[in-house]
């Protein structure tokens, strides 16, 4: 495997780890993967550029309903593309397909378009920016 292919595989794996941390509500894993000064545009931000981690931490800290069992969640990166801008900056773009159960217990799949920027800092890739859009 070439160095570029290895780096591409690593970034796709890190992106999957990031989505798994979000799905599991694992703040510690999320923090290991993202930069302190993460920026983003996402539907929850209502068109505003969010900077830092406090906005995201709010969602991780929300209590679950103990009366309801956790729903299974599977995230698939459909048609992922990795583009390197340098040895230390890369873009990962894909459609995320999130499979779960609705309130009636039926399987549902929800798509969203995501673009994520990663920067290698001190030899470690950190997630530094993302843009997530719901299909119109």
Language-model features, listed with the residues they occupy:
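A solvent-exposed, acidic/Ser-Thr-rich amphipathic alpha-helical stretch
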Residues: 8-9, 27-88, 94-95, 109
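Basic/polar N-terminal segments that are highly enriched at the extreme N-terminus
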Residues: 1-9, 136
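Short beta-strand segments enriched in hydrophobic/aromatic residues
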Residues: 34-35, 96-98, 131-134
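Short beta-strand edge/turn micro-motifs at domain boundaries
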Residues: 109-136
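A short, structured loop/turn motif at beta-sheet edges
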Residues: 82-90, 105-106, 118-124
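Short, cysteine-centered beta-strand-loop-beta hairpins and adjacent loop/turn segments enriched
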Residues: 99-108
């Amino acid at each position: 495997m070439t160095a570029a292919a290895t780096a591409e595989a690593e970034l796709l794996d890190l992106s999957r780890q990031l989505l798994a941390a979000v799905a599991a509500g694992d703040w510690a894993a999320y923090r290991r993967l993202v930069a302190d000064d993460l920026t983003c545009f996402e539907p929850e931000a209502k068109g505003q550029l969010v900077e830092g981690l406090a906005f995201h931490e709010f969602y991780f800290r929300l209590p679950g309903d103990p009366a309801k069992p956790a729903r299974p969640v599977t995230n698939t990166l459909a048609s992922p593309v990795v583009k390197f801008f340098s040895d230390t900056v890369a873009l990962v773009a894909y459609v995320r397909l999130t499979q779960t159960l609705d309130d009636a217990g039926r399987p549902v799949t929800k798509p969203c378009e995501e673009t994520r920027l990663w920067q290698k800092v001190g030899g470690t890739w950190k997630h530094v920016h993302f843009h997530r859009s719901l299909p119109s």
